[in-house]
């Protein structure tokens, strides 16, 4: 048998399908026809994410999203009803949007959508269901926070922002516990039931009447109101600085090194995400090669941007043994400084280009992935050809453009270092790094 690999074929070109838009009452249907794709994905986007929650109702988005799954009849009735049509419910909340949806066979879409519309517009919202879901979320919060990496990420908001972003998306244990069934009902009536939103539909649309789908989902709901946006202020305090979230006796530490970043609309995405990939977004990234391959401190280290409508965050993260914590922090910051000073290599440039262009036909090969891209466009007011523009931006990347991105988007001098670990063991080594003042907090005191 031959022992050589067959030659690689030419890279397939890719263009994101152009969506069609249909205005129906107070809402808009955004659809992509994919002939032969018999599993249709529908997503309803409301612009009421966690960022616009009032401070006395933090977490109401997440709790309402959970409660909708109880359906119009309550007591977790929605999933079995949808299953009779081969459909599956989905719901999620982020800082900028409240997204509900379903995946259903094309020949059962109409029946499934009627159930979906009832669940979104006319849910039971039984007080017992709301209290049950709230208690489940509270229990889940601390179960998830038992993982050091999760606790570190949830501790980050209050170090970078004041206002809503200072508390985790789910509201934190104290704020979430204060939400009553009446609060959920009021939020749902004002922000979900009475607001049409945008309906994303992707799949084989032969025989599917988009206008009728829109009428079923939107009903007489009003159009989406304008959202007021303002950049949240940072908390007081010296930068850079270190926060230790104390876990006595822990033999490992979870690290997050982060700083504020521009909003989604303010960044050149290929340049910003490209330089993040060089630093920590690939196996061959600078952080992984240093902390994992050379020093042997971790199984993996990474970095990425979290870009929102009104602000953003850049962060690096890893988990290491306690005794290597301080050196891991300084080594990570040194990698950023070196990247800002010396720039990227030609090999890194090629890797960034190829990883964000070659795989696009596979990345957008399913109705769900196409729907996800359309939801992103709706949430961030992106043009219909956003994916193609983004691909072209990656293809245009040069060493010079990535080098300038390193100095424009990476700011270690503004960083906050969050370490979850044994404070007694970590305080002095982290103080000795000279990064900045070191504060120690107990996890239960973070979200009072």
Predicted regions: what they are:
Residues 41-106, 127, 169, 281-297, ...:
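M16/MPP (pitrilysin/insulinase) zinc-metallopeptidase core fold and M16-derived inactive scaffolds
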Residues 2-22, 158-197, 229-234, 360, ...:
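Histidine-acidic residue clusters that define the catalytic metal-binding segment
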Residues 29-48, 57-60, 64, 143, ...:
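His/Glu-based metal-binding/catalytic segments typifying zinc-dependent metallopeptidases
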Residues 71-74, 102-136, 282, 302, ...:
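M16/insulysin-pitrilysin zinc metalloprotease superfamily fold
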Residues 16-19, 24-27, 37-41, 55, ...:
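Extracytoplasmic
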Residues 79-187, 235, 334, 348-372:
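Acidic/histidine-enriched segments that form metal/cofactor-coordinating
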């Amino acid at each position: 048998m031959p022992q050589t690999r067959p030659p690689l074929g030419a890279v397939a070109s890719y263009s994101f399908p152009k969506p069609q838009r249909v205005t129906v009452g107070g809402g808009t249907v955004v659809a992509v026809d994919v002939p032969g794709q018999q599993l249709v994905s529908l997503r309803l986007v409301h612009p009421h994410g966690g960022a616009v929650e009032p401070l006395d109702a933090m977490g109401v988005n997440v709790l309402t999203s959970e409660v909708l799954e109880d359906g119009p009849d309550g007591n977790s009735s929605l999933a079995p009803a949808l299953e009779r049509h081969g459909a599956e419910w989905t719901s999620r909340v982020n800082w900028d949007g409240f997204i509900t949806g379903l995946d259903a066979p094309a020949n059962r879409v109409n029946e499934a959508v009627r159930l979906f519309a009832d669940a979104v517009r006319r849910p039971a919202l039984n007080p017992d269901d709301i209290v049950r879901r709230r208690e489940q979320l509270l229990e889940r919060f601390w179960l998830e926070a038992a993982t050091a990496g999760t606790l570190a990420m949830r501790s980050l908001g209050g170090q970078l922002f004041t206002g809503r972003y200072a508390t985790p998306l789910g509201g934190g244990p104290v704020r979430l516990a204060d939400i009553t069934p009446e609060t959920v009902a009021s939020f749902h009536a004002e922000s979900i039931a009475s607001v049409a939103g945008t309906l994303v539909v992707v799949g084989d649309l032969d025989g599917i009447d988009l206008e009728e789908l829109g009428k079923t989902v939107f009903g007489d709901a009003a159009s989406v109101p304008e959202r007021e946006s303002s950049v949240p202020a940072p908390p007081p305090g010296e930068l850079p600085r270190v926060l230790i979230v104390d876990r006595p006796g822990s033999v490992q530490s979870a690290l997050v090194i982060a700083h504020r970043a521009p909003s989604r609309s303010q960044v050149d995405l290929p340049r910003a995400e490209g330089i993040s990939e060089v630093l920590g977004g690939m196996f061959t990234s600078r952080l992984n090669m240093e902390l994992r391959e050379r020093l042997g401190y971790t199984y993996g280290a990474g970095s990425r941007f979290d870009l929102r409508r009104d602000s953003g965050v850049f962060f690096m993260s890893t988990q290491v043994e306690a005794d290597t914590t301080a050196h891991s922090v300084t080594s990570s910051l040194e990698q950023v400084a070196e990247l800002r000073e010396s720039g990227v290599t030609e090999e890194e440039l090629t890797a960034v280009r190829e990883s964000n262009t070659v795989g696009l036909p596979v990345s957008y090969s399913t109705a769900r992935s196409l729907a996800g891209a359309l939801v992103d466009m709706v949430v961030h007011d992106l043009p219909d050809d956003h994916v193609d523009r983004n691909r072209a931006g990656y293809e245009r990347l040069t060493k010079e453009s990535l080098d300038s991105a390193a100095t424009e988007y990476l700011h270690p001098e503004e960083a906050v270092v969050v370490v979850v670990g044994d404070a007694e063991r970590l305080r002095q080594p982290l103080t000795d790094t000279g990064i900045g003042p070191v504060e120690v907090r107990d996890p239960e005191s973070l979200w009072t």
